[in-house]
Amino acid sequence: MVKCSYEQKPFRREVMRTYGANVTPSPSMETEVGRKINAEFPGTTGSLGCAISEAVEAAAQNEGYRYVLGSVLNQVLLHQSVIGLETKAALDKYGIKPDMIIGCAGGGSNLGGLIAPFMGEKLRGEADYRIIAVEPASCPSLTRGKFAYDFCDTGMVCPLAKMYTLGSGFIPAPNHAGGLRYHGMSSTLSQLYHDGLMEAVSVPHTAVLEAA
């Protein structure tokens, strides 16, 4: 579990422990890549990229284990599209036609899932939604990143992906939305943004909490 979230959200880790999980804050001293990151960034609160690297190493070194990336990649967005399908079904039921779709963006799986059916209509010319990704100011991959091939994890063991990225070695400052602290953005969303089919803004987490 990313150390930032491990410390900020103790109830989440305790729920996992209740169901029998061993929960370790990342970066840890239990893996080679974790020790390397701790040495390079003393006192770091980690990132999703760090946790992915440690999980991949742990799976690779233990017989019978496999690691499946849970964000960013296309198959994850496809699975998450149930979010958008249910949203669209609910809106259709009540006769609501949105003109704007807004969602938070970290690695992109939730946003990609939300906008999937709406973006499909937009690409087919059936509707013209304004689609906006809202990312944390502490980790603004779309608004300040570079569109290039990069590793999906800090330890550089996962495959390369073409995406908007701040660099696989980027360690973001802590913020309240630990799940959004990822250095890159889904290749699919990156291409849509690059092609001008969606917008992006970066917002400080304090401003988001005040607005809510």
Question: What spans do the regions from the language model cover?
Answer:
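Active-site/ligand-binding loops adjacent to catalytic centers
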Residues: 31, 36-77, 83, 95, ...
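Repeat-solenoid scaffold signature
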Residues: 100-132
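Active-site nucleophile and cofactor-binding loops and adjacent substrate-binding regions
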Residues: 3-5, 102-107, 135, 202-205
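Buried hydrophobic positions in well-ordered alpha/beta secondary-structure cores of metabolic enzymes
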Residues: 16, 55, 87, 101-103, ...
